[in-house]
Amino acid sequence: MTMKMMVHIYFVSLLLLLFHSYAIDIENEITEFFNKMRDTLPAKDSKWLNPACMFGGTMNDIAALGEPFSAKCPPIEDSLLSHRYKDYVVKWERLEKNRRRQVSNKRVKHGDLWIANYTSKFSNRRYLCTVTTKNGDCVQGIVRSHIKKPPSCIPKTYELGTHDKYGIDLYCGILYAKHYNNITWYKDNKEINIDDIKYSQTGKKLIIHNPELEDSGRYNCYVHYDDVRIKNDIVVSRCKILTVIPSQDHRFKLILDPKINVTIGEPANITCTAVSTSLLIDDVLIEWENPSGWLIGFDFDVYSVLTSRGGITEATLYFENVTEEYIGNTYKCRGHNYYFEKTLTTTVVLE
């Protein structure tokens, strides 16, 4: 073996050793992070945990009344922990004040907590899940849920010429339950034929190819679920209102007074205005920058407020109490959209 080869092997071995040591350090830090999280749990939760098991976090999932609900055990879904558990079984238990009860098989689907018809009584319940691997390691998590009312119909506007080669994406917003069987789409109450020419479907997305004005309309997606016992007995729907508009003129005019006339000890404000001819709402975004180049948000002392109506966007810069340090400062107003960007400046001066 040559000296060059020995040196190469030495450095490769050293790198592998360092990488292994670094990986161990990361895993130890992850474990410590979840141990600290466990210590902050309220007593009503922590008393049910098995000290021999690692703690893998809590989850508060969204549910909709009258719809299916499912939840994964937190450590299985957590990006910091999921890589540790590949071959495992999950046990679910409902936590009550003075006892815990095993969840029946009808409420478990593919290892997840599954509730076919979520009602308000479930929103107050806590569930403990225990993941046990093939070699006997275990990790636990706690799941709660809260109710969110789904929107009746979500509007979406698409401008022709924007991303025509990719088509229009419509997402079926079923977020509260996994393991659905299939999704069917309707336009204006007529079922859509997924022919992979005009329409294609990927997971929860409907893709409308070669967009045109006639694609405007009401789109409903119907999600079909298999319950544990009965096939295709649950259907949930969501709605989108699509408006396709012609290609727009995205040019705009930015208007700003070059001076802010102020009085020491008093409030002051100035408005930067963008006037657009586009039909799109919020086509122009306006931002204020301070003299150091930092964006100004809704902070104390100096802050900005954005409003938009009928093709006019305004960003007002407010000074709560003008002091001498503001005199002579120059602030930049930046208006931009996907196509254009314009900037104007204004300087604080004493009246």
From Swiss-Prot:
Belongs to the interleukin-1 receptor family. Glycans are attached at N117, N182, N261, N269, N321. It is found in: Secreted. Residues 246-345 form the Ig-like V-type domain. This is Soluble interferon alpha/beta receptor OPG204. InterPro entries: Ig-like_dom, Ig-like_dom_sf, Ig-like_fold, Ig_sub, IL-1_rcpt_fam, Immunoglobulin_dom. The keyword Lyase does not apply. GO terms for cellular component: extracellular region. PROSITE patterns: IG_LIKE. Keywords: Disulfide bond, Early protein, Glycoprotein, Host-virus interaction, Immunoglobulin domain, Inhibition of host innate immune response by virus, Inhibition of host interferon signaling pathway by virus, Interferon antiviral system evasion, Repeat, Secreted, Signal, Viral immunoevasion. Residues 65-137, 155-237 form the Ig-like C2-type domain. It comes from Vaccinia virus (strain Dairen I) (VACV). Counteracts the antiviral effects of host IFN-alpha/beta and key IFN-inducible proteins involved in viral RNA degradation suxh as host OAS1. Acts as a soluble IFN-alpha receptor and thus inhibits the interaction between host IFN-alpha and its receptor. Pfam families: ig, Ig_2. Disulfide bonds join C73-C129, C172-C221, C272-C333. Residues 1-19 form the signal peptide. Interacts with host IFNA1. GO terms for biological process: symbiont-mediated suppression of host innate immune response; symbiont-mediated suppression of host type I interferon-mediated signaling pathway. It comes from the Viruses. Induction: Expressed in the early phase of the viral replicative cycle.
